[in-house]
Regions:
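N-terminal export signals
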Residues: 2, 7-28
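A short, basic/flexible loop-to-alpha-helix module at the beginning of a structural domain
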Residues: 25-37
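Aromatic pocket-lining residues of Rossmann-like dinucleotide-binding sites
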Residues: 57
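Conserved N-terminal/central alpha/beta ligand/cofactor-binding core
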Residues: 11, 62-63, 69-169, 173, ...
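Flavin (FAD/FMN)-binding glycine-rich loop and adjacent Rossmann-like elements that form
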Residues: 97, 101, 120, 133, ...
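N-terminal Rossmann-fold NAD(P) dinucleotide-binding loop
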Residues: 50
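Beta1/beta-strand and adjacent pyrophosphate-binding region of the FAD-binding site
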Residues: 36-47
Length: 484
């Protein structure tokens, strides 16, 4: 049996053990021999959180390797076509509070015509799908421009990026994260690292390293997935006029939203032409001429930690896209000749694992504006939970009772495994609290904080758990993060 075959069987067996148990079985196997790559900081996942973690760590002096299973950085923003960036302002709408790397990315996109600055984008308009709550000062952007910019920023910072490379399992030294086993076009590879950042969204590294995790709400329920798609060749003036003429009919009943084009959806349902879980169609105007983003499909029962479930979701997402395109062509003024530009190359996922950390973001703290002393970001994003207990049509949207709330650094420090940091929607948080900060601007701020923390820990010769949080907060402030 050749070496690659032995490695494949070994990897498959270990992964099976991890899937059946708590994740520690696979990770507990020590690695011997020289690593294929050696780095200070390994970031697993190149999405919004991961790319910001990588850039921040590198700018603060660390050698950084990013492992990304696709062929691009940006994750949901580029692969998933998720947009716009949700609000980065406080509740009053007066102050931009998610800044730092996020603001730099926005400003560089604006300078090349790839985004609209959020200061000039308001709720109740076409760039926010006419949704007022939580949609003031969103950031429309062009995902193609973002792909190129993120490549440039990683190159400028000296970040090494491995595309088309899948994370297989952690490498642990006892209960210390020490790297990862990977699989790419050249077969299995191993990377040694001093600190690891889990930016997988699903907490894959943490789970397989044995860190306690909760899937969804802990009772088998997860928020539904959505397939985003972009369309063009729209007569935007006619579309906008139709919405404006009917906007007074927007309402919510029994947790179900009746917003854009619900007056046509009712007709399509009666004609047997609409079998989707939502009773409206949410469209966001894009950056290009007469380009629109559709965020409307709901795919219930998707467990994105399971490949079979995720595969079914991709197929269902494209089927739902076809239903909506037919609907647009037949019913919506200005969309008679709409052209489908693209669907997401991956379905949009709102929720999977919540990883246990040294602190837990609690929904009551979010709603009441609690700001821990070691807060590494401030946000005002509302608690946005899609899908009810037994009804994917409903949603729960709760605005906060303060101008902002904070996320503790300890929510990014994984419990029980040293030198492992979390960034993005897999942070340590109650499911409803994570429903507030799962959107991209807070995830990018978490990434900047995690990457900065990793670099500072290495400089100080301490673990991330032992890092003086006041030093981290001071460094983030100096690097243009807004922390009050």
């Amino acid at each position: 049996m050749d070496a690659n075959r032995r490695e494949f069987l070994k990897g498959a067996g270990l992964l099976a053990a991890a899937a059946c148990g708590g994740g520690a079985t696979a990770a507990a196997v020590p690695e011997t021999g020289a690593a294929d790559y050696a780095t200070d900081v390994l970031v697993v996942g190149g999405g919004p959180a991961g790319v910001c973690a990588a850039i921040a760590a590198a700018r603060n002096g660390a050698r950084v390797l990013v492992v990304e299973q696709s062929g691009m950085l940006g994750g949901m923003a580029t692969q998933g076509l998720v947009g716009p960036f949700m609000t980065c302002y406080d509740k009053s709408g007066e102050t931009m509070i998610i800044r730092g790397l996020f603001e730099e990315i926005v400003e560089r996109l604006v300078a090349r015509g790839g985004a609209l600055h959020p200061r000039g984008v308001f709720g109740n308009g076409p760039y926010s799908a006419w949704i007022p709550k939580g949609h003031d000062h969103v950031t429309p952007f062009d995902p193609e421009a973002l792909k190129v910019l993120l490549d440039e920023m990683c190159a400028e910072a000296g970040v090494k990026v491995l595309f088309h490379t899948t994370f297989v399992e952690p490498v642990l030294d006892g209960w210390r994260a020490a790297g990862a086993r990977l699989f790419g076009k050249g077969g299995f590879r191993r990377v040694s690292a001093k600190i690891v950042g889990d930016a997988t969204g699903d907490g894959d590294y943490a789970y397989r390293a044995g860190v306690p995790c909760t899937l969804g709400d802990g009772n088998g329920r997860l928020m539904p997935a959505t397939m985003f798609f972009h369309i063009c060749n729209i007569d935007s003036d006619r579309l906008i006029a139709d919405i404006e003429a009917n906007r007074h009919t927007f309402h919510k009943k029994d947790g179900v939203s009746y917003r854009g084009f619900h007056w046509y959806v009712t007709k399509a349902i009666a004609a047997g032409e609409w079998d989707l879980p939502r009773r409206c169609l949410n469209m966001y105007r894009g950056v290009g001429p007469d380009v629109w983003l559709v965020n409307n499909g709901r795919i219930p029962g998707v467990d994105a930690t399971d490949s079979e479930s995720l595969s079914r979701a991709e197929v269902e997402g494209r089927r739902q896209t076809k239903v909506m395109m037919d609907f647009l062509h037949k019913y919506v003024p200005g969309c008679e000749h709409a052209v489908l530009m693209s669907t997401g190359s991956t379905v949009g996922i709102r929720e999977t694992r919540h990883v246990a950390g040294e602190a837990t973001l609690r929904v009551e703290d979010v709603l009441n504006g609690v700001v821990p002393a070691d807060s590494i970001l401030l946000a005002a994003n509302s608690v946005d939970v899609h899908g009810g207990k037994d009804n994917p049509m409903v949603s729960s949207y709760r605005t906060i009772n303060a101008n902002w709330y904070g996320v503790s650094y300890r929510c990014l420090v994984a419990k029980g495994v040293e030198n492992l940091l979390l960034a993005g929607r897999c942070l340590s948080g109650e499911p409803a609290a994570a429903g507030a900060v799962r959107v991209m601007p807070p995830c990018m701020a978490m990434g900047q904080a995690a990457g900065t923390a990793a670099a500072l820990a290495l400089q100080g010769g301490v673990t991330p758990r032992a890092l003086d949080a006041s030093k981290l907060v001071a460094t983030l402030r100096a690097q243009k993060a807004f922390l009050g």
